[in-house]
Amino acid sequence: WYKIGEGSESVLESRWYEGEPIWVTAEKQGKVSATYFWPGSEAEINGKRPTYWYVFDASTSNETIIDQLLAWLDLPEGERPVFMTAYFNDANYWGHTLGPEAEGMDTVIQGLDLDLGRLIAGLTARDLLDKVNIIVTADHGMVEIDRDRMIFLDDYIDLEDVTMAGWSPVAGIIPNEGLEDSIYNSLVNVHPQLSVYKKEETPEHLHYRNHRRITPIIGIADEGWSISTRDYYNSNPEAYIGGTHGYDPDFLSMHGIFLAYGPAFKDGLIVPSF
């Protein structure tokens, strides 16, 4: 199975990555690229890696990351990256831990704003601010969850009859041989906050039908609801508190920011969500 996160061995396996990351495109063109934490950047993809890259370490400070970005820009031409990525974990970690509406999240966002200011100041000092293109974005939103909004699959099916490839808020369900219709019929329409689909019937806007790794049955919780088992729920009193993501992307809570600045972008332009 693939599992993202610190210490995961699967993130090093190129077989999981079928798209072409931008840094691979750059390297194919003979350009220098650099990544400071980004999904896929620890693996060799299509025979390529970034010129400079780091193994994910959640304890790395944002100041360390930003200072390395600036140090890369100080390298001589030919060694200096023309494409760089950096990932900051604060909003995700604390969003999961506290929940996105928690008072402490204001402090987290203020800290990230200061970190961005550190980068801008470094670019300004190097007379690069108006010569580089900067994109600030997020991979997902976040919504509050709590232990009162639960869907227990074992109320409806025998978990010995399935393999679970994911739990919440999207349950990836692989029925044992010959049981697909039975499992589907046992789950569809049994809970008002759970939508259940066969792979080929998922909503078009999810773009989640055709890949071979998509499970035969998919259960999707409504916004703010969680999918679990009663045993796991009862054994883990700290679970399902705080925030999470992965719900239908039509929910505004799942939207992320996308800000861009630099010579390649129109000043003041606002575009529709995408």
Identify the residue ranges that each predicted region occupies.
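His/Asp/Glu-rich, glycine-adjacent segments
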Residues: 1-100
